[in-house]
Amino acid sequence: MREIISLNEGWTLRFPKGERAAETVTLPHTWNAVDGMDGNGSYLRTTGVYSRTFKKPVQPLAGGRVYVEVLAAALDATVKVNGTVATTHEGGFSIFRADITDLCRDGDNELTIEVSNEDTPSMYPASADFTFYGGLYRGVNLISVPNAHFDLDYYGGPGIMVTPKPTADGGATFEIKSFVTNPDDSFTVMYSIEDPYGCEVASAVRPSDNTAISIYVPDAELWSMDEPNLYTVVARLQRNNEAFDEIYANVGVRSYTVTPDGGFAINGEATPLRGVSRHQDKLYKGNALTVEDHYQDAQIIKELGANTIRLAHYQHSQDFYDACDELGFAVWAEIPFISVFKSGKDAHTHVMEEMKELIIQNYNHPSILFWGISNEILIGGISQELVDTHHDLQKLCKELDPTRLTTIAHVSHTPTSGPMHRITDVESYNHYFGWYGGKIEQNGPWLDKFHAENPDICLGISEYGCEGIINWHSNTPQCKDYSEEYQALYHEYMAQAFEDRPWIWASHVWNMFDFGCAARSEGGVKGRNNKGLVTIDRKTRKDSFYVYQAYWAKDPMVHIAGRRHAQRAGETTEVKVYSNQDTVTLYCNGKEVGTQTAHRVFKFDVALDEGFNVLMAVADTVKDSITLEKVETEPACYTLPEFNERQEGVANWFKQMGSMDLTAPMEFPEGYYSIKDSLEELAKNEEAFAVTAKAVKLATNFDIKPGEGMWAMMKKMTPEVMAGMISIMPDGFIESLNAKLIKIKK
């Protein structure tokens, strides 16, 4: 029988280039757990060599095969047994295995896995707005099987494919195919289907060289986000009265559709998908997460009331997909074809292989409804080769899995018509109106305009959000002040905008959790993206978390916002309450302030007493309370210092323009720099780049430096494109930048 042996203990990690001393580690492990998010501006991208010994497992009968299974190695790996290469693998997010039987010897065997998170010419991701952690961050197993066994070689797959389909009479057919290695005429495959309660409801037997079958189950219980009923399909490789190998798959019976006007429906019921995106890292663990970490994340998302998760921007752990199956989430699973397109045959082969691994390894998960083929890939521009690659990926998805829909996440400046549309079954945009530029109120009109111009496209929003840092607070929140209040205000608008538009097939907040991004330095916090609804340590649910809980959660809830804005000045202060109940009553120090009937967001003007005040909100059977202190002057530490500095810098920038008419048509004289030049081109001239870098910093709070941070992702962009992405510059700003650049000769 199959035996799976964990090899997570007792590894030695050394660095051949000598960046760090050798150490003993336990898997899951990453060498970037700290420097990948500590804000020092860079992190170790190198090769690490993991090594340990093992004893060859022995099957009861003669023979048998031994495999090493690597659950993920970031970003590429070479596996050796006793000094001989067993396999190599490019791609940091998928399972891969190697048959090492013939490399093993009696007694101790040495297993070494060389792992690198350095960039390579053909591998994705090339550059992106998150840390590329290095290491064996999911674990390693030995798998011992008889000579005849269910397949372990094909793209890291599970050896079985199950396609449940509901039937008109309330039953379901389970189309099953398993893959047997080294079968002979004496073997059969026995299938058993167990219902969500563990009772066998159907079975069948097939010859081992022709395993495909369709099994009917009456009165099938459907899988949905509200009722995630799971069936278990067990496959046993049988000879006489002995089971030689056994595998299983947890699956769900469901059907779903997406239409441009009706949005998403599951099992015939209209159900707008409203949820979040998620990265796989945690404070000072990096991406080396345990099973408990994955399930904790899924439980917090369930607490939010979300029914969908976009798993960005790569294949996630089987543990998390399992959690989504069990808890009921509609999952968007994608490959790291992101930001920067790499030209050439090798890069094309690599991205196709990543899609094959994603689909083959995850085909049985009922939670996965959408395969995502790329994210913001036009950041570096468009080419026919890029478009053709998308068509190739779409074709591949349909060949491997005709049962699911495909999707894409367009960068904001992707034209609303053109060759990138109508490739995938459904589409989404990443938009940040109200954060990187523009106004929150632009979001709704943009959605309506796109829908009117493209009535045949199923439209979703795959990313939207803004940073919220729980140190910063404001009574008058503004874009780019990084306050918890502005983040909540932003999401109040967005939650309502999507509720008003059920035809938006899915919306995904960017992001559920703050996450590591070593290149970032924003809002006084370095090394992280702080757009999460929950902090990176999972300790604090920001006020914006409760905005969505009020809109999405089914259980009664009430939450008083602003509890970290604990010291308030003024005769009165605004107190916001979020609730999914119709009516909220607020009390201050036991006295009723008022009762309001509203939709999700309740606002009260409260006259605080001197000193400390206890506020309590009551909504039907639920209540919440906070304590506020009335003070003469609110602490200066509530305001991000650089917010005022940047506002002053923008004002000074315009003063330098004098009386120039910034409404006049822009000019682009030949032989001079302009906003049409890429950052890479502008960097060739010290003066031109200094002007551009200052403009970008003032308008977006991004520091751009050649060779540092997100330079690889941004270098092909022009200031003109950046401005067009999301109205990124203040009015007149791009014109003033161009006016300065056209004075600088190339």
Task: For every predicted segment, state its role.
Residues 3-17, 40-41, 45-153, 183, ...:
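Accessory beta-strand-rich segments of carbohydrate-active enzymes
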Residues 7-9, 15, 26-40, 100-172, ...:
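An acidic-aromatic loop/edge-strand motif
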Residues 27-38, 84, 118, 123, ...:
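Extended substrate-binding grooves/exosites of carbohydrate-active enzymes
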Residues 46-58, 154-170, 549-573, 642-643, ...:
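Extracellular ectodomain segments of secreted/surface proteins
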Residues 64-66, 170-176, 571-575:
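Structural beta-strand segments of beta-rich domains
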Residues 102-108, 177-259, 611-612:
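Extended acidic/polar, glycine-enriched regions
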Residues 145-149, 153-169, 264-284, 640-672, ...:
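Compositionally biased low-complexity segments at domain edges in trafficked proteins
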Residues 662-734, 738, 745:
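Compact, charge-rich alpha-helical regulatory domains located at protein termini
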